[in-house]
From Swiss-Prot:
It comes from the Bacteria. It is an enzyme of class 4 (lyase). Substrate binds at residues 27-31, 77, 154, 209, 327. GO terms for biological process: protoporphyrinogen IX biosynthetic process from glutamate. SUPFAM superfamilies: UROD/MetE-like. Catalyzes the decarboxylation of four acetate groups of uroporphyrinogen-III to yield coproporphyrinogen-III. Gene3D superfamilies: 3.20.20.210. Belongs to the uroporphyrinogen decarboxylase family. This is Uroporphyrinogen decarboxylase. The gene is hemE. It holds the Pfam family URO-D. It comes from Saccharophagus degradans (strain 2-40 / ATCC 43961 / DSM 17024). It is found in: Cytoplasm. Pathway: Porphyrin-containing compound metabolism; protoporphyrin-IX biosynthesis; coproporphyrinogen-III from 5-aminolevulinate: step 4/4. InterPro entries: UROD/MetE-like_sf, Uroporphyrinogen_deCO2ase_HemE, Uroporphyrinogen_deCOase.
């Protein structure tokens, strides 16, 4: 077992004392970095990066060379599971992910098989083990998956969607078939994340990008319940350490109390929820991750620092906070502004941990 030189991130997730608030950024390996764009050009396209463990490792580590981050996150895509189910993932420039096949009937769902990660997605596990080796204990590595609901939206719509009309029609017209789809996806996510943990992931995050589009009750049935099932099925210890789990529903602020009962160690917050109020609502059940608006990175470094100070003050003293953006960093951000954000967290947060 490699000794972790910096375990601040894992300690905060488990609400253990830390010397300062740990920080990382969703999509920290991404198009805002010129070195990422250069590696992606060499790979040919996005999937060429994802499916090559050495290149995936290279881009995973790039932000750590620039910034004093407290965690690395596996470079991959949330849609690897539907791709492994045979739907044929591809990317069109400027249009995002698309699938050659879609799911539209109960018969389509019946035919889907739960994935076998080592057989279907070996390149992901190879990337995890390669990154762990190269990190050599520098910081922990986060593995991840999309949530069943979020994966289902892409599988049914065939790509991105503004209103999820087809997926919502499925859950309302054919709730039993929709439940079967969520079950198969939950079982696939359990297998996928456990394989990542076996390969060396030291924490895992479930990205529920589109849960916030659901009604109050539909969220609990078709998004939260499958995620709770996943949390229950995950390996919670590896290499003698607990493997913490983060749940992140974009637009999920109204469900924090229910999410806190799902068994995860930490809840991710987007920027529409006040983190101080969120802390009061969940108490000491879970840690919180977030939640600066990524668009603030387009402001001046001084304004970025002010916003970091405001969020730290809102959360208040003590552990249980992982600083992050409220969603992924966007491609037009100046890398210097991202650096100002990371440095501000380090410089301003120690006073809250005395």
């Amino acid at each position: 077992m490699t000794v972790l030189k910096n375990d601040r991130f894992l300690r905060a997730l488990m609400r253990q004392p830390v010397d300062q608030t740990p920080v990382w950024m969703m999509r920290q390996a991404g198009r805002y970095l010129p070195e990422y764009r250069a590696t992606r050009a060499q790979a040919g396209d996005f999937m060429g990066l994802c499916t090559n463990p050495e290149r995936a490792c290279e881009v995973t580590l790039q932000p750590l060379e620039r910034y004093p981050l407290d965690a690395a996150i596996l470079f991959s895509d949330i849609l690897t599971i539907p791709d492994a189910m045979g739907l044929g993932l591809y990317f069109e420039t400027g249009e995002g992910p698309k699938f050659k096949k879609t799911i539209s009937t109960a018969a389509d769902i019946e035919k889907l098989e739960v994935i076998k990660p080592l057989q279907d997605l070996p390149y992901v596990m190879d990337a995890v083990s390669t990154i762990r080796r190269e990190l050599n204990g520098r910081v922990p590595l986060i593995g991840f998956s999309g949530s069943p609901w979020t994966l289902a939206t892409y599988m049914v719509e065939g790509g991105s969607s503004k209103d999820f009309q087809k997926t919502k029609a499925l859950i309302y017209n054919h709730p039993e078939a929709a439940a079967q789809l969520m079950d198969k996806l939950a079982d696939s996510v359990i297998a996928y994340l456990n394989a990542q943990i076996d390969a060396g992931a030291q924490a895992v995050q479930i990205f529920d990008s589109w849960g916030g589009a659901l009604s109050h009750d539909a969220y609990k049935t078709f998004s939260l319940a499958p995620m709770a099932k996943i949390v229950k099925g995950l390996k919670r210890e590896n290499e003698g350490r607990k493997v913490p789990v983060i749940l992140f529903t974009k637009g999920g602020g109204q469900w924090l109390e229910a999410m806190a009962d799902a068994g995860a160690d930490c809840l991710g917050l987007d920027w529409t929820t006040d983190i101080g109020q969120a802390r009061a609502r969940v108490g000491d059940k879970v840690a919180l991750q977030g939640n600066m608006d990524p668009s603030i990175l387009y402001a001046s470094p001084d304004r970025i620092r002010e916003e970091v100070a405001r969020i730290l003050a809102s959360y208040g003293a003590g552990t249980g906070h992982v600083f992050n953006l409220g969603h992924g960093i966007t491609p037009g951000v100046d890398p210097e502004h991202a650096g100002a954000f990371i440095r501000a967290v380090g410089e301003l947060s120690a006073q809250y941990h005395k």
